[in-house]
Amino acid sequence: FNTYIYNNTIFTKESILSKIAVDKASNGVLVANNIFYIEGESKHVLGDQYKPDKGGSVEIENTIFQNNLFLKNSYWPKNALIQPSKSLFGNATFRNTGGEKISDYVPLNTKLIKDRGIVINKIPNDSIGLDGGFKVEFDILGNKITDIPDLGAIELN
């Protein structure tokens, strides 16, 4: 199966260890236009944590992992099975970092976020795509997405 992870805003506070797992059986992965605001450390762990694979290296075919914003360039473990490319680094400067409401995660650093997304297309060799298509009309707060998407889950207007 193909996995599409795009236009999300992911926040974890400094006291949380972020665990990164990519199953060796993966084939067809797209991770793009996300904001990874991870204040603490991260660690690579083996596959599905309920049934961890035995580890080892393998190339995950049909992978697109690009155009994501990371708070710091040391976030993604170097031994993870997929590695980001064409990444951006910097502080999204959320309205209320650590808050409990979605609106707390409106990015204020517009220069880093606005219109910096890429258009999402099918993963190579994906004959189906997504049932509803790839273009998202509205963000999580109901803001209309126009032209080039922004990074993260919230469209800046």
Where are these regions (language model features)?
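Long hydrophobic segments that form regular secondary structure
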Residues: 1-2, 6, 11, 15, ...
